[in-house]
């Protein structure tokens, strides 16, 4: 029978000092012996996805204490990728994931907490906490802050839906008037919550449902809706049950590695492919699997991308649907239900509710259940009122979107495409693979060939695009922006946005060893591995070299003879794999990150071999 970890600090005469300090935090005499549960919050006023989380920790804590636990809250950092984007701040985004994972480990292990409730929301916070959860392997439940409502504005006598990416594109488009750009900017992000499309934050929060680590609705219920409060309340109650199951009943099925096992990671990736999620999710799933010592790699993702169809199309891949529409169509449980009916789901995986996924779908898939409360839950909709407050409205759609032929979520037979929304490409320019979000690629661009125009940084690429150096038909190559070379693997949303604003969005391809925002669409290929700084072939590309992209064949090729590549490699080995004439200040903290960073095909995690004796 496992012993409560917290007993290390609460039992025995030699722990008198620790107990004295616990008492100073409010622990009462009869509390000693109860499980100590860490409430891992990420409230910050810097990030709209987290600005409403201030009171959420105490809401969860209250339920933990009612259920017989001791709740102790702490906060992690949280970087807003949108605000950090387009300048040196983006260098810090991906490295913050490792800091978050480490800080959770530090706090939980230093104080011997027995379990965790992770209150996350945005891009690197959910992955960082997930890495920590898989690393620590103590009972955990995730509950996120929820998606933002889609923005709305009236243009040309039509009401249109908006999101952050619309504001960015219009702001860079020289044909858009200042007045129209400002109108869109003011309407794009109306409420608290994670940005309203299927960007990285919402993709990751959806994946926690598929992994079994969060409750149904976690990924899709709006941040502003009153129904979301119940997810926090239930998380507080449920974590105490999970904790007691493990420590008092020796039930290891309550542990995250036994819930989010390999089969669950396959489910999460299947969901990601089916919903056309952010390509960043590949990084984070690979990293989390490694933390959980689960054998799951790019080969698995490649295999799944060939057989899982694209069942749900959401902004930025279409302006028609946002997260509020996904929820109306039944949310993650509805997509998983369609995958299950198509024979593409491992339905015997476990969940934090103590059910198998099959049992959970029977209760929560709107195409199966007749439970009126569940159906009402998925009719929760937006209010259209600007606010930074959680649970501030109780609006409902008149009816659910259960149209599986032409609606937001579709059956396999009526899929947006029979191949999924993400694909792994490989070839001599990326021998360990690269990622493209096929959900955002127009059909005429699935095959593309053109001459390279090479930039040594995102900054120079932006300058080149806006300065008219990039021409239709070219492949824009941005290198030395990988985990090590950046360092920090910046998102390339501005280059892709500016290509669109310059009328080149469908006329050019973009290849990088950096990554893309979940808001990116178009023929944008990232995560080229190995990265340039690690000797990847992307570092050998010259202006004018022909690059051939064939998504149906999953290939990407630099059309240069091998003998020429070998000669270039020998020369580059002498020069060192560094960008030419790039002016960038790199702090000691970022240099420390770069010194251990692996390429994207490994999840951009730290190279553990450098620590092994």
Swiss-Prot record:
Pathway per its UniProt entry is: Amino-acid biosynthesis; L-isoleucine biosynthesis; L-isoleucine from 2-oxobutanoate: step 3/4; Amino-acid biosynthesis; L-valine biosynthesis; L-valine from pyruvate: step 3/4
Would the keyword DNA repair turn up in this protein's UniProt record?
no
Gene Ontology cellular component?
Answer: cytosol
In the record, N6-carboxylysine modifications are located at: 124
Class of enzymatic activity (EC top level)? lyase
Reaction catalysed? (2R)-2,3-dihydroxy-3-methylbutanoate = 3-methyl-2-oxobutanoate + H2O; (2R,3R)-2,3-dihydroxy-3-methylpentanoate = (S)-3-methyl-2-oxopentanoate + H2O
Pfam families per the record? ILV_EDD_C (PF24877), ILVD_EDD_N (PF00920)
Q: What is its EC number?
A: 4.2.1.9
Annotated GO molecular function terms are: 2 iron, 2 sulfur cluster binding; dihydroxy-acid dehydratase activity; magnesium ion binding
GO BP terms: isoleucine biosynthetic process; L-valine biosynthetic process
Query: Where does the chain bind [2Fe-2S] cluster?
Result: 122, 195
Q: Among its keywords, does the record have Amino-acid biosynthesis? A: yes
| UniProt feature coiled coil, ranges | none
Give me the residues that bind Mg(2+), please.
81, 123-124, 491
Per its database record, what is this protein's job?
A: Functions in the biosynthesis of branched-chain amino acids. Catalyzes the dehydration of (2R,3R)-2,3-dihydroxy-3-methylpentanoate (2,3-dihydroxy-3-methylvalerate) into 2-oxo-3-methylpentanoate (2-oxo-3-methylvalerate) and of (2R)-2,3-dihydroxy-3-methylbutanoate (2,3-dihydroxyisovalerate) into 2-oxo-3-methylbutanoate (2-oxoisovalerate), the penultimate precursor to L-isoleucine and L-valine, respectively.
- Say which family it is in: Belongs to the IlvD/Edd family.
Protein's name according to its UniProt entry? Dihydroxy-acid dehydratase
Q: Which organism is the protein's source?
A: Aliivibrio fischeri (strain ATCC 700601 / ES114) (Vibrio fischeri)
- The gene name on file is ilvD
């Amino acid at each position: 029978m496992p012993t409560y970890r917290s007993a290390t600090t609460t039992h025995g005469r030699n722990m008198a000092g620790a107990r004295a300090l616990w008492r100073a935090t409010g622990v009462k005499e009869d509390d000693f012996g109860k499980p100590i549960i860490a409430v891992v919050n990420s409230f910050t006023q810097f990030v709209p996805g987290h600005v409403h989380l201030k009171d959420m920790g105490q809401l969860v804590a209250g339920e933990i204490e009612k259920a017989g636990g001791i709740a102790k809250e702490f906060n992690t950092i949280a970087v807003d990728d949108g605000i950090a984007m387009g300048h040196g701040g983006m260098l810090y985004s991906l490295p913050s994931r490792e800091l978050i994972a480490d800080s959770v480990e530090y706090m939980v292990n230093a104080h011997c907490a027995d379990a965790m409730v992770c209150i996350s929301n945005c891009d690197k916070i959910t992955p960082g906490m997930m890495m920590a959860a898989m690393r620590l392997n103590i009972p955990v439940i995730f509950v996120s802050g929820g998606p933002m409502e889609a923005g709305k504005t009236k243009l040309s006598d039509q009401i249109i839906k908006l999101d952050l990416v619309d504001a960015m594109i219009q702001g860079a488009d020289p044909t858009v008037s200042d007045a129209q750009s400002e109108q869109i900017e003011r309407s794009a992000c109306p409420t608290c919550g994670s940005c309203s499309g299927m960007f990285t934050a919402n993709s990751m929060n959806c994946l926690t449902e598929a992994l079994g680590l969060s409750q149904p609705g976690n990924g899709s219920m709006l941040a502003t809706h009153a129904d979301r409060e119940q997810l926090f309340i239930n998380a507080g109650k449920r974590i105490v049950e999970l904790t007691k199951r493990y420590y008092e009943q020796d039930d290891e099925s309550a542990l995250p590695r036994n819930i989010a096992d390999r089969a669950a990671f396959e489910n999460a990736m299947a969901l990601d492919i089916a919903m056309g999620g952010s390509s960043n999710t590949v990084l984070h799933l690979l990293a989390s699997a490694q933390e959980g010592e689960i054998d799951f790699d790019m080969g698995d993702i490649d295999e799944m991308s060939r057989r899982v169809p694209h069942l749900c199309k959401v902004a930025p891949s279409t302006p028609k649907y946002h997260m509020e529409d996904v929820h109306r169509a039944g949310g993650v449980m509805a997509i998983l239900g369609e995958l299950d009916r198509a024979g593409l789901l491992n339905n015997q995986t476990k969940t934090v509710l103590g059910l198998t996924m099959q049992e959970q779908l029977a209760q929560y898939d709107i195409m199966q259940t007749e439970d009126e409360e569940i159906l009402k839950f998925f009719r929760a909709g937006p209010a259209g009122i600007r606010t930074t407050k959680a649970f501030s409205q109780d609006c409902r759609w008149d009816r659910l979107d259960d149209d599986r032929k032409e609606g937001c979520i579709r059956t396999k037979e009526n899929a947006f495409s029979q191949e999924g929304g993400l694909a792994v490409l490989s070839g001599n320019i990326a021998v360990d693979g690269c990622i493209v979000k096929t959900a955002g690629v127009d059909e005429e661009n699935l095959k593309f060939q053109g001459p390279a125009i090479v930039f040594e940084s995102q900054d120079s690429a932006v300058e080149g695009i806006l300065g008219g150096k990039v021409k239709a038909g070219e492949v824009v190559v941005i290198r030395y922006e990988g985990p090590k070379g950046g360092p920090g693997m910046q998102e390339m949303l501005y280059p892709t946005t500016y290509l669109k604003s310059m009328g080149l969005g469908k006329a050019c391809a973009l290849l990088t060893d950096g990554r893309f925002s979940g808001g990116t669409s178009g023929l944008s290929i990232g995560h080229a591995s190995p990265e340039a700084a690690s000797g990847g072939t992307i570092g050998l590309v010259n202006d004018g070299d022909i690059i051939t992209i064939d998504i149906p064949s999953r290939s990407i090729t630099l059309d240069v003879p091998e003998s020429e590549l070998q000669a270039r490699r020998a020369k580059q080995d002498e020069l060192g794999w560094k960008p030419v004439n790039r002016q960038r200040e790199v702090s000691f903290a970022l240099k420390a990150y770069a010194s251990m960073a692996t390429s994207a095909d490994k999840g951009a995690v730290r190279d553990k071999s450098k620590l092994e004796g």
